[in-house]
Amino acid sequence: MSLDEAARQLKMAVHDAQVAFDCVGLGDLDRAQEHAVTARAAVDAAEVALARAQQDMSPEEAQAAGERAVVALEDA
């Protein structure tokens, strides 16, 4: 996995956590739980990608790849 994937998963986790939070406020607990589980899965996937990147990349490579990943998501 790449830092692109880690960034994408983290962005998805933030979205799903926000939806879960909003659903709690609406009293839709089934949907809140569904999105909380999805957020957790995305965070877990991001953690795996980040751990792999730590093993495979130098700090300089990680900085460059991380910047590209974030810019790509912001442009999407």
Report residues per predicted region:
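C-terminal-biased regions
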Residues: 1-76
